[in-house]
Design a protein with these regions (language model features):
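Short alpha-helical segments enriched in small residues
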Residues: 1-129
Length: 129
């Protein structure tokens, strides 16, 4: 059983729905879930918010957060996750933003850096890889 299958199984068991707000992954997270049988029981919504304007409009990321921390930050990823969860009444959500490359990286935010925001049952947390 792959990770997507494990996630769908767990979400079904808990009777949770999931939504995604993706940037650098371009919808690949949701696509993995859709490939799993019974995904329709758990996948609520998925949006690709590549541009900052889309992050603000569809994932409720504040302009101030983008200005202060940038599109690739844990703050932005958290707001993406919370925004897409609340907009779609999801129990669980993920916000993903990063530097896909091959250019665009900096010393502080190198190519390959990805920030993850998670919303689970009203709690929000994040991580960077």
């Amino acid at each position: 059983m792959n990770k997507a299958e494990q996630l769908v199984k767990l979400l079904i068991e808990k009777k949770y729905t999931v939504s995604f707000a993706e940037s650098c992954t371009g919808g690949k997270m949701a696509a993995r879930i859709v490939d799993v049988p019974d995904a329709s029981k758990v996948l609520n919504a998925s949006i690709v918010t590549y541009a900052n304007e889309a992050k603000m409009k569809y994932a409720n990321v504040s302009k101030d957060t983008l200005k202060q921390y940038g599109a690739v930050s844990e703050n932005t990823a958290r707001e993406m996750a919370e925004g897409v969860a609340k907009a779609n009444n999801a129990d669980v959500a993920a916000g993903i933003s990063g530097i896909a490359g091959p250019t665009g990286g900096t010393e502080d935010k190198p190519v390959g850096m990805v920030c993850f925001g998670f919303y689970i049952d009203g709690k929000v947390f994040s991580d960077t890889k």
